Amino acid sequence: WMVVDMIQQVSKPVETYVAGDDDQAIFRWAGADIEHFIAMAKDTNNTVIPLTQSYRVPKSVHTLATKMAQSISNRIDKQYDPRDDEGERKVLNFRPLNKSLAEGEWLILCRTHEIVKQVCESLDRYGWLYKCYGKSIVNEKIIEAIVSWTRLQKGEKVSGARIDTVYSFMDSTRIKRGHGTFKGSHTELYTIDNLIHSFGLRENIGGDLFTKTLHWYDVLNAKGIRKRIRYLRAVMRDGHKLDDKPRIEVSTIHASKGGERDNVMLLTDLSYGPY
């Protein structure tokens, strides 16, 4: 607020707009000054323009949120109407996530990073595609490598650019020394036989495993993909494509400010750290 006051003094603006909601001031720990904001709203020299209509919050959620807001001791009384939809509010058990989240789009909000981690581990076991803090858990390059190797295994030709990606997820037990980076043209097309004969792909792995017969999860073994193989296979077993749009997102309450989905799950669990 000192910076805002200084800018006003120096620039001499005709009007300054300050937007906020004292009921959602969850960043006090990061410097949010709720008392100063409320004082500005009560200053008769300032004009307050309340936004009285929500276009996102349904009635059932609005009732609960309003009841909780009444317990805030220092707040601005305000009119805030829900959208014209009853909505639905459920109390769900964290444990049977596989039943609760089987259908629809979900935003899972957690109080701590540790709880986010636990939820993600559960989603991994169930084989569901999801985003964590807004980013897909499946790297696009990993998807490209899996699809490209599967095509090679079927006898199809693949571009050198895609083969370069495949090679980036293999170690020296799959590729001969000196061929860690694909040396061919990125625009040319190659078969798996081309790679074995001219570009360092080993014909056999471990002495008796014929490379051409191996699935992607046996061939792609670099560190970046190895720890995700079990999860990726679980996703595919569940009938999903790796490049499907994730319908589940996991985040802390703080990090998801402004996020929305058809269904929102709020986990009130606390890990040991915050106590």
Where are these regions (language model features)?
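Conserved interdomain hinge at the start of the Helicase C-terminal
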Residues: 91-104
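Conserved helicase motor core of SF1/SF2 NTP-dependent helicases
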Residues: 1-85, 107-125, 133-141, 244-249, ...
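Short secondary-structure boundary/capping segments
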Residues: 81, 98-100, 240-241
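Alpha-helix boundary/capping detector
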Residues: 30, 66, 87-94, 149
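Core RecA-like ATPase module of SF1/SF2 helicases and allied nucleic-acid translocases
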Residues: 110-275
